[in-house]
């Protein structure tokens, strides 16, 4: 069910990117990259503030995670809060970028409005959506609750989003896991 929902979101994302056109979608890709960079500067301090606001499920005996080694189990709360902080900072910066994108939409794009340009825009839109979904799923993967872990592990699409996307998987693991808990 999760796999179907994720694929549906990605298909919808392709359609939206196809309708927007290449110029606007390239702008949104740049806004995503810039937002990811700036979120990387603020996420740790934000994550520390969430310890009292957002509860984290304590790991229980015999329960682990499918996506992180067992020796990191008792430090995953740091990754969870850092992920929440990063996602919040990313959302704020990306929202500013989307607001500015309203003006990019005014640029005439008649010359690059062909079918292949629109397909390229759809692919870029899927890439942006994939990054956001990967952040959300990686945050969920840190929660040591059996229902969450089993749901993510049974979903082929979610499992590949968390572990197998070439560039962003390493980026997220580097800033959320390696930088925080080694």
List each model region and its residues.
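Alpha-helical transmembrane segments and their juxtamembrane interface "caps"
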Residues: 1-182
């Amino acid at each position: 069910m999760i796999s179907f929902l994720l694929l549906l979101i990605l298909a919808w994302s392709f359609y939206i990117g196809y309708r927007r056109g290449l110029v606007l979608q390239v702008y949104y890709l740049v806004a995503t990259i810039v937002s990811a960079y700036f979120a990387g500067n603020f996420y740790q301090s934000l994550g520390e503030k969430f310890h009292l606001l957002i509860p984290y499920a304590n790991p229980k005996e015999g329960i682990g995670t499918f996506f992180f080694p067992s020796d990191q189990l008792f430090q995953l709360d740091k990754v969870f809060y850092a992920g929440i902080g990063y996602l919040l900072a990313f959302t704020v910066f990306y929202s500013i970028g989307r607001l500015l994108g309203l003006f990019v939409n005014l640029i005439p794009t008649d010359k690059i409005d062909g079918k292949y340009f629109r397909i390229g825009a759809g692919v870029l839109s899927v890439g942006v959506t994939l990054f956001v979904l990967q952040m959300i799923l990686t945050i969920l993967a840190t929660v040591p609750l059996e229902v969450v872990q089993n749901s993510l592990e049974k979903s082929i699409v979610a499992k590949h989003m968390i572990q197998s996307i070439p560039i962003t998987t390493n980026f997220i693991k580097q800033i959320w896991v390696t930088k925080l808990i080694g």
